[in-house]
């Protein structure tokens, strides 16, 4: 970026056994999805044996599985609305999720009625948390998930 005259915006993301799940909330166009995708890309690069452009003091680990739900994946051919697709994704996540899992979910709870979406999201989050999985979730608002939050 320096050679191209562009500014680099470093990000700090820290997950520990005590703080395994990060919820990034904020307005549209605030950088939530970019942060989520950056973490996912860097993790895939590491696990593929590629050099990872991070600070020399950074520490990363390997996961047995990386699960992602990023983007609107509705399908006319498969008769799936955004809501139906998301439920199928979460069903798959629940089957695969363990303490060796990194999950990345963009706009958690969207595609449904806000009240129902919030309740379902909270239920899925409880399972991910109980299985000691690591993850990052983006959303427009945190909803009732603050009980899982350290701060």
How would you label these PLM feature ranges?
Residues 1-151:
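ATPase nucleotide-binding head domains, primarily ABC-like/P-loop NTPase cores
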């Amino acid at each position: 970026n320096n050679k191209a005259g562009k500014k680099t915006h470093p990000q700090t993301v820290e997950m520990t056994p005590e703080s395994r799940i990060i919820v990034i909330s904020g307005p549209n166009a605030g950088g939530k999805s970019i942060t989520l995708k950056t973490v996912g890309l860097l993790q895939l690069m590491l696990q593929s044996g590629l050099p990872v452009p991070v600070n020399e003091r950074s520490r990363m680990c390997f996961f047995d599985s990386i699960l992602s739900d990023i983007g609107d994946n509705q399908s006319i051919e498969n008769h799936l609305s955004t809501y139906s697709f998301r439920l199928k994704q979460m069903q798959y996540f629940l089957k695969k999720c363990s303490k060796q899992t990194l999950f990345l979910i963009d706009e958690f709870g969207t595609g449904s009625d806000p009240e129902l979406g919030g309740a379902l999201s909270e239920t899925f989050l409880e399972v991910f948390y109980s299985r000691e999985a690591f993850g990052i979730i983006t959303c427009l608002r945190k909803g009732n998930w603050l009980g899982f939050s350290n701060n």
